[in-house]
Amino acid sequence: MAALKEARSYGLSCGRVSDGSRVSVFHVKLTDSALKAFESYRAHQDSVSLRPSIRFEGSQGHISIPQPDCPEEVRAFSFYLSNIGRDSPQGSFDCIQQYVSSYGDVHLDCLGSIQDKVTVCATDDSYQKARQSMAQAEEETRSRSAIVIKAGGRYMGKKVQFRKPAPGAADAVPSRKRATPINLASAIRKSSGSGASSVVQRPFRDRVLHLLALRPYRKAELLLRLQKDGLTQADKDTLDSLLQQVASVNPKDGTCTLQDCMYKSLQKDWPGYSEGDRQLLKRMLMRKLCQPQNATTDSSPPREHGRSASPSQKRPTDFIDPLASKKPRISHFTQRAQPTLNGKLGAPNGHETLLPAPGPTPSDTLSSSHLPPRLEPPRTHDPLADVSNDLGHSTQDYKHQEATPAPAPHLGLPLLTDFPQAEQPTSSSHTHSRPKKKSKKHKDKERPPEERPPAPQPDAPTAPALPPDAPGLNGACDNEPTSSSETPDYLLKYPAISSSEQRQSYKNDFNAEYSEYRSLHARIEQITRRFTQLDAQLRQLSQGSDEYETTRGQILQEYRKIKKTNTNYSCEKRRCEYLHRKLAHIKRLIAEYDQRQLQAWP
């Protein structure tokens, strides 16, 4: 197969294999012995009468490959079938076939989407190769170790005579002391050797527990790691039985993961740990011990196992947020959604933090030049960890948002509403109104739509006026005032957390409504994305030009089209904002509880 060249275009076809054809595409993972058997057959397939075959039996099966040296015999390799979408949440792949046409051109053909994976199981040859690799690693370790000469050898009994040096002149300055040179390498070895010797004196079970607590190990890797500190033959013989008691073995890759019940036996001041290892263990203990005993835990190792904690941290070392999985990002979004309790939520340290809006809405995106950060989908291990880049971060981020607002010039653009267009006044780009006008506008909103008087048109010479059929900037569901006397139901239903069972219950409620929140937010964002693009184009054009009027008319046309196809937008937006505030409240309570547990941990 010819390699694809850079800076060259190739044709990609998807029609060679029709939907009705019986072609299935799999991702196949072979062992070394299976790959050698395939290559041997490919090299001598003309001299072999038999043909390879594959047989599926449910989620398992076997592959038969003829042997060129024994034409009448075949080698059988068993395999198991797994779903890529379930095992790896990153998604599936497409199978692309490269072929050369009759004219000599290179083409690419998409055979289909790879949804299943075939993993060939290891055979005796694979285990034999693993044993040889392990023996070779032990031999290399033994060759680097020191040779101890026992007393009573062949050199015993020989005497060595030392001659005394001739008396020389005495030092003219008796009080002078000569500095003894220091060997830096030997000093480092002594300091590191003291920690290793203290680890060797500890029980073998504790040594294995504290190694598996940091990350999963294969048995061969664990043996090599234990040999660095010192390993006796008796401890080596008991390793298999010990792993069965304290670890869970993954049958796919053979990695050993420490069982959750064993984390209570760990010591944070283990002598073999570095400062980064202690920070990592502290986070792991917080995550494991905060979960209730009857909660279902994942058998896969936590993601912190793969890396050690950095000594320099942006947050103080006494607070490590177990839910934070991303760096905090400051939002430049200035207008907020409907406030809860006067727009504030209590922070863990006593300050009040401003709750960001749930996502881009028509009024937000059309009246601001900045989009709020887009909410990202949750990760598979914990949906609470990645609700939004605007939720669950430290109080300093929220204080920074309150202290440094970024007002931008706004532009009057249409917004989806539920009441007739004929009753809405003409609107232009709005400026920040005075308090009297703002309170009057809120009073008008509390009336039914048919009783509202036309709103006065603000003076803004920098933006065009929309035609009479366009609604105002503030729709029925845009910024409904929330009375400070009415406490939201979630504040009464979800008080502060006092136990791990209550934490798990809050987390379950969060997960139950988070999918609905994501769906609503995605629909709202899809509606507003087009208006945001047109708004950016309109800001770059000069008022009164042909391009300006064309873009402005396109905005109105897009608005009318979206209003016809999305009649329930106002209700969905209201529901999305409510879920945003509710989920943010639950997440904040969980973060406060975890912080209290972490500070109380000795």
UniProtKB/Swiss-Prot annotation:
Residues 454-470 have a biased composition (Pro residues). Residues 488-598 form the OCEL domain. Residues 292-489 are annotated as: Disordered. Coiled coil: none annotated. It comes from the Eukaryota. The keyword Nucleus applies. Residues 332-341 have a biased composition (Polar residues). Keywords: Acetylation, Nucleus, Phosphoprotein, Transcription, Transcription regulation. Residues 431-444 have a biased composition (Basic residues). The modification Phosphothreonine is found at T180. It is found in: Nucleus; Nucleus speckle; Nucleus, Cajal body. PANTHER family: OCCLUDIN AND RNA POLYMERASE II ELONGATION FACTOR ELL, RNA POLYMERASE II ELONGATION FACTOR ELL. Belongs to the ELL/occludin family. Component of the super elongation complex (SEC), at least composed of EAF1, EAF2, CDK9, MLLT3/AF9, AFF (AFF1 or AFF4), the P-TEFb complex and ELL (ELL, ELL2 or ELL3). Component of the little elongation complex (LEC), at least composed of ELL (ELL, ELL2 or ELL3), ZC3H8, ICE1 and ICE2. Interacts with ICE1 (via N-terminus domain). Interacts with ICE2. Interacts with AFF4; the interaction is direct. Interacts with EAF1 and EAF2. Interacts with USPL1. This is RNA polymerase II elongation factor ELL.
